[in-house]
């Protein structure tokens, strides 16, 4: 029965993505929704290559949120769009760049002038000198790998435009209700019916891409010992050539415990008594219950900085785990936006509260 339900869910997801691709290809707008465990919000989305003053005005009048343009890193580099801040500590680390206007614009705020700016961002032959900074359009840089890395509207909208053959820039705007609060699932259904728009979920796009793509590959597999415990070691490389290691302890089942940890030099780990003891505690628990310790090469020693676990989710999926007991060093660990990978967090456990 679960397999049938899963197949039906996948079928519906593919239908929604195919419809959204066709809408984007025709220059229409769609509503894109993220997971309930993330922002749980909907954005109006259309391909920047199809921008018009009328579309910008519709977003400003009916969606009411911040009008942004999601772009690839390649576009940002070509137009010399630097990050808005050096240290991004926003909730979901949304990658805003410095705001921009078209150089030929007057104030830059009208629908027509914002459309001028959007067209420059979408034009593959445009030059950074055509823009002035700051301005009234907010570019956002999508992570390389798209929604398979970060399950956000920025990545989902760029993925959708690419799938539709409309380049890698999308205009997006959050949808708010008349009272100024954010529109949620029931509100978005009403919004779509009123404006005759189709809806697509970012998890749908993840599922659609996962049918034919993977950003990870196994480069080695061996039986070994880790800190004195028998384990199966898996070495992975992702699309950015980052190296990740998974140690599987005990009997790995569909439902298993998972602990994420940053890759760090042995001397640093041993020098940090708190982290070392926490790791030992986690390994005891994983061996007893059956689970996986995943060392992520994420460029930071602070795992709390990882708000999206796209690569980690693919590693978990590769190991045959779908229902996760998430081990962490605190009660506030996030593992969001993973339903498109066919995963569910069924329990969160504080490592420090487990009994070795």
Curated annotation (Swiss-Prot):
Family in the record: In the N-terminal section; belongs to the DHBP synthase family. In the C-terminal section; belongs to the GTP cyclohydrolase II family.
GO cellular component: cytosol
Marked site: Essential for catalytic activity: 136, 174
Cofactor note: Binds 2 divalent metal cations per subunit. Magnesium or manganese.
Keyword Metal-binding tagged: yes
Protein name as catalogued: 3,4-dihydroxy-2-butanone 4-phosphate synthase
Pathway connected to this protein: Cofactor biosynthesis; riboflavin biosynthesis; 2-hydroxy-3-oxobutyl phosphate from D-ribulose 5-phosphate: step 1/1
Names of the cofactor(s): Mg(2+); Mn(2+)
EC number(s) reported in the record: 4.1.99.12
Reactions mediated catalytically: D-ribulose 5-phosphate = (2S)-2-hydroxy-3-oxobutyl phosphate + formate + H(+)
PANTHER family linked to this entry: 3,4-DIHYDROXY-2-BUTANONE 4-PHOSPHATE SYNTHASE, GTP CYCLOHYDROLASE II-RELATED
Annotated positions binding Mg(2+) 2: 39, 153
Database matches in SUPFAM superfamilies: RibA-like, YrdC/RibB
Native source species: Sulfurospirillum multivorans
UniProt function note: Catalyzes the conversion of D-ribulose 5-phosphate to formate and 3,4-dihydroxy-2-butanone 4-phosphate.
């Amino acid at each position: 029965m679960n397999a049938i339900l899963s197949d039906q869910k996948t079928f519906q997801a593919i239908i929604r993505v195919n419809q959204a691709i066709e809408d984007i290809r025709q220059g229409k707008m769609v509503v894109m929704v993220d997971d309930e465990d993330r922002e749980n919000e909907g954005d109006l989305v259309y391909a920047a290559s199809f921008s018009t003053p009328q579309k910008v005005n519709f977003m400003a009048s009916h969606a009411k949120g911040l009008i942004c343009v999601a772009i690839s890193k390649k576009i940002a580099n070509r137009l010399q769009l630097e990050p808005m801040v050096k240290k991004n500590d926003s909730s979901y680390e949304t990658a805003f760049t410095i705001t921009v206007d078209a150089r030929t614009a007057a104030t830059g705020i009208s629908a027509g002038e914002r459309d001028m700016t959007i067209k420059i961002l979408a034009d593959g032959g445009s030059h950074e000198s055509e823009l002035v900074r700051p301005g009234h359009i907010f570019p956002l840089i999508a992570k390389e790998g798209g929604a398979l890395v970060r399950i956000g509207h920025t990545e989902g909208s760029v993925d959708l435009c690419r799938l539709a053959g409309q380049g890698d820039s999308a205009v997006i705007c959050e949808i708010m209700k008349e009272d100024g609060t954010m529109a949620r699932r029931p509100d978005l259904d009403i919004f779509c019916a009123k404006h005759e728009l189709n809806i697509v979920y970012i998890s749908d796009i993840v599922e659609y891409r996962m049918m034919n793509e993977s950003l990870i590959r196994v480069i080695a597999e061996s039986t070994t010992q880790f800190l004195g415990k028998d384990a199966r070691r898996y070495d992975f490389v992702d699309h950015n050539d980052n190296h990740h290691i998974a140690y599987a302890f005990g009997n790995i089942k569909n439902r298993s415990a998972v602990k994420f940890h940053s890759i760090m030099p042995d001397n640093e780990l041993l020098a940090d008594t708190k982290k070392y003891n926490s790791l030992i505690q986690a390994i005891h628990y994983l061996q007893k219950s059956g689970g996986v310790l995943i060392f992520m090469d994420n460029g930071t020693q602070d795992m709390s900085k990882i708000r999206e676990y796209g690569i980690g989710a693919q590693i978990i999926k590769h190991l045959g785990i779908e229902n996760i007991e998430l081990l962490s060093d605190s009660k506030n660990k996030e593992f969001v936006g993973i339903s498109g990978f066919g995963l569910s967090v069924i329990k969160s456990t504080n490592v420090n509260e487990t009994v070795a």
